[in-house]
Each structure stands twice: as structure tokens, then as C-alpha cells.
Amino acid sequence: MKLTCVMIVAVLLLTVCKVVTSDQLKKLRRECYLEPGDSCFHHDGRGACCEGTCFFGVACVPW
């Protein structure tokens, strides 16, 4: 029982670390350059917003 709980916690921690690391790497590589609330009208919406998505070409909206 304890081993199962430890394994579940380990998987959850690895998943969270993977998400955080991928976001940090994305910013370091300059794949994203717009923060939430920034206008994305003149930018390609794919990958331009660091957090969230480009909402109808108007602004970056966090998820």
C-alpha cells in the first residue's frame, strides 16, 4: 500500500516537473515572447503567447 502511494506521488511530481521545465525551456528558446494581455494581432498565434493562447488575434489569454 505504501509503495503504491509513493509511486503515485512520484509520477505526479515528475509530471509537474516536466510541465514546468518545458515552459521554462520554451521561454529560454524565445519560442514565446508575449505575456498574457499582450496583443497578438500582428504575430503568428502559434507559440507566440508564453502562457495560454492567442484569442482571435486580439490578445494572449491564459489557460
UniProtKB/Swiss-Prot annotation:
Record keywords, A-Z: Disulfide bond, Knottin, Neurotoxin, Secreted, Signal, Toxin
Keyword Signal: yes
Domain remark from Swiss-Prot or TrEMBL: The cysteine framework is VI/VII (C-C-CC-C-C). The presence of a 'disulfide through disulfide knot' structurally defines this protein as a knottin.
Protein name (record): Conotoxin Cal6.37
Chief place where the protein resides: secreted
N-terminal signal peptide: 1-22
Gene Ontology cellular component annotations, sorted alphabetically: extracellular region
UniProt note on tissues of expression: Expressed by the venom duct.
Gene Ontology terms, MF aspect: toxin activity
Compartment(s) of residence: Secreted
Keyword presence, Secreted: yes
Source taxon at top rank: Eukaryota
Cysteines engaged in disulfide bonds, as pairs: 32-50, 40-54, 49-60
Lineage: Eukaryota, Metazoa, Spiralia, Lophotrochozoa, Mollusca
Function text: Probable neurotoxin.
